[in-house]
Every structure is written in structure tokens, then in C-alpha cells.
Amino acid sequence: MAVPKRKMSRSNTRSRRSQWKAAEETLVTSTVRGQVAYSRPHTARVVTDSAGTPLYLEYKGRKVKDL
């Protein structure tokens, strides 16, 4: 493990840490029953019945897993 040769000042430490930013989450749009739905890419979608009960997971139009 690398060991720093000198102590890093509080100012330099904080300015270095301030450059780190969380990446904005990417969303994919899909149309479900005539409504636009946003979801994360490469994740399965939960298919529900009219009462809202989850039935199964769907990915790229295929049934993946029963719930």
C-alpha cells in the first residue's frame, strides 16, 4: 500500500474531495399500457394485474421469473 510522504493539508484534502460527484442515473423510457414508464437500463420490470398484485418479472418482452 502506498504511504504518503507528507501530511496533506485540510484545505487540499477538502478541495480534492469536493471534485467527486455522484453520477446522474440514466433512465430508459418504455411504454406500458399506453403510458410512458421510466426504469433503469438492463433491469427486469415487474408486471402486475389490474389490482396491482405483482405477477412476474419481464425483461425485453420475455417472462423471466414468477413472483
Curated annotation (Swiss-Prot):
Signal peptide: none annotated. HAMAP family: Ribosomal_bL32 (MF_00340). GO terms for molecular function: structural constituent of ribosome. Transmembrane segments: none annotated. Residues 1-19 have a biased composition (Basic residues). Belongs to the bacterial ribosomal protein bL32 family. GO terms for biological process: translation. It comes from the Bacteria. One of its GO terms (cellular component) is large ribosomal subunit. It holds the Pfam family Ribosomal_L32p. This is Large ribosomal subunit protein bL32.
